[in-house]
């Protein structure tokens, strides 16, 4: 690595680490004594997540453990040795779970259709089961700011709902707390960090599934907006934490029904 790249890496790492720490603090993601399961896919974002948590583990005033977990779904061409070899250099506890979900998905989903939805649901269930069985207190996912914004627009445009990915949530089955420490970090930052660190990236399309065309459309739309109006993504992201229920139409969030003439002050 050249001296220039070393300086770039140092600056970028500090920047990402600061944003990660801010997100963790603002949403109380990690507590003293936690056992954090980092879900490692072999993609740039999960590598970045693991690196940031390992750095914070050294600096934080509290103690917490980190367990890296990868789910080998038996996709054809999956390089089984890549993640174990990488994780051994980190001297941390790690587990490779082997489940042939690939065959199940291929049997259920017609050829040419996107398999990501079913695949992700099966993967989530397996990882949640592992977390419960191994006394994991928090499940850490590598979703970043752009993922959160894109999910907001996917729900807005295609589901008719105002929702996204929270930085922290209790899973639907109430068995696990899920955290997203990279919530304040942009995809541009994780991509550049991955290149500078030279992570051993595992392709995400080994299954042969087509990209979700709706997500591709949303991503392209947001990138065009950002090119025309820099900081647009930051403004949208800020809006997700600046919501006024009384200015919306959801009767579950605000009691419109009981606003009456008796409330008028003159």
From Swiss-Prot:
GO MF entry, a single one: magnesium ion binding
Pathway: tRNA modification
Keyword terms: 4Fe-4S, ATP-binding, Cytoplasm, Iron, Iron-sulfur, Magnesium, Metal-binding, Nucleotide-binding, RNA-binding, Transferase, tRNA processing, tRNA-binding
Cofactor(s) the protein needs: Mg(2+); [4Fe-4S] cluster
One of the protein's GO biological processes: tRNA thio-modification
SUPFAM superfamilies linked to this entry: Adenine nucleotide alpha hydrolases-like (SSF52402)
Keyword DNA damage: no
Enzyme class of the recorded protein, top EC level: transferase
UniProt short sequence motif PP-loop motif, positions renumbered to this chain: 41-46
Cofactor binding: number and manner: Binds 1 [4Fe-4S] cluster per subunit. The cluster is chelated by three Cys residues, the fourth Fe has a free coordination site that may bind a sulfur atom transferred from the persulfide of IscS.
Protein name (record): tRNA-cytidine(32) 2-sulfurtransferase 2
Biological source species: Francisella philomiragia subsp. philomiragia (strain ATCC 25017 / CCUG 19701 / FSC 153 / O#319-036)
Protein encoded by which gene: ttcA2
